[in-house]
Regions:
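Glycine-rich beta-strand-centered segment in the early N-terminal region that forms part
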Residues: 20-34, 48-95, 134-136
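NAD(P)H dinucleotide-binding glycine-rich loop of Rossmann-like/cofactor-binding domains
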Residues: 91-169
């Protein structure tokens, strides 16, 4: 089968690989769509992403497709089913798993990180991690389920209430998803900070009340000018020290600051403890997607969440290397890989 194999920093090779074996509990999926994630970029750049990778490995953890075959112990799935996956497979036996925090599993299997993933024509996945797509969900939308599930976990930790004022920093795919989820959670005023005009325009179409150029405008002054009062929640979706510091600066009294964007492991931020104390800020973060996959699927299938407007292109495996290596390409939006192209 055709696959994109990661051999090390800046070394991704599109090559023929053996079709995966199907174990007793496995579902063999013919991959139709696999999203390119920021974690894939971190791995390609040699940084530590959300999981360790031991090359050679087929990357890709956001994918959907058609069931090709099932193992002898598999129940609930059959060839022809349209499915997507939750790529984070906990062991169920370690202390975190037994304590109900299995996203901190000590022996986590990660499809597309610790084992082969979806940047290939086929991937074999444990049945526990497979979900059927709704009738109204395309493969490209199904591939977006995992990032939506991650966003939901972050939203759950933000304490958003009806009437809340929320600022989202970053208008990439994650920021645009967060913005919509914030609206669904009941926030009445949602502001997006994003330097790229095209992304600000998409945000306004998706329901943002205000979109501010975060580089060329004085953000606090613009918020005041537009009558934005106390900011209850700030969700940082960029993963850069400067934007995390900005989030703390613009957060209002008793606000929650969600640090959602993935930084590099050695990066640091400068925080004035007195500012945190004076405003009674809650600084928090979220990690992957515990128990949120089903909710993500239902939001997408119901049409309550637009996961298509931020997609720049459905590309081929041969284009993946360029996408991972070129920030200008990624700035255009979300890329979905179709291994059959």
């Amino acid at each position: 089968m055709k696959s994109a194999v990661f051999y090390g920093k800046h070394d991704l090779r599109v090559e023929e690989s053996a079709k995966p074996a199907v174990g007793r509990r496995d579902v063999l999926i013919n991959v139709k769509a696999c999203g390119v994630c920021g974690t894939d970029v971190h791995i390609y750049e040699g940084d530590k992403g959300a999981a360790d990778v031991t090359p050679p490995t087929i990357l890709g953890h956001e994918f959907a497709g058609v069931v090709e075959a099932v193992g002898s112990d598999v129940a609930g799935f059959k060839p022809g089913d349209r499915v997507c996956i939750d790529p984070n497979h906990p062991c169920g036996c370690c202390e975190p798993c037994r304590d109900g925090i299995n996203h901190y599993c000590e022996h986590m299997t990660g499809y597309g990180t610790t084992v082969n993933g979806g940047f290939a024509e086929y991937c074999s996945v444990d049945m526990q991690q497979v979900y059927k797509l709704g009738d109204h969900t395309s493969f490209e939308q199904g591939a977006m389920t995992e990032p939506v599930a991650c966003c939901l976990h972050g939203i759950d930790m933000c304490n958003i209430k009806p009437g809340s004022t929320v600022v989202v920093i970053g208008g990439g795919m994650i920021g645009l998803l967060m913005m919509q989820l914030v609206k669904n959670a009941g926030a009445t005023k949602v502001v997006l900070l994003e330097p790229v005009e095209g992304k600000r325009e998409v945000a306004l179409k998706l329901g943002a009340d205000l979109a501010i150029d975060s580089i060329h405008e004085d953000v606090p002054a613009r918020l005041k000018q537009e009558g934005v009062g106390n900011v209850d929640v700030v969700i940082e979706c960029v993963g850069k020290p400067v934007t995390i510091e900005q989030a703390i600066q613009i957060a209002g009294h008793k606000a929650t600051v969600m640090m959602f964007g993935l930084t590099k492991p050695d990066e640091t931020i400068t925080v004035k403890p007195f500012e945190v104390f004076q405003k009674e800020l809650v600084l928090t973060s979220s990690y992957i997607n515990p128990y949120t996959q089903r909710r993500a699927l239902e939001l997408i299938d119901s049409g309550r969440l637009d996961v298509s407007s931020m997609v720049a292109k459905v590309a081929s495996l041969d284009e993946l290397g360029a996408i991972l290596s070129d920030p200008a390409l990624r700035a255009m939006g979300k890329y979905i890989i179709d291994p059959s192209k």
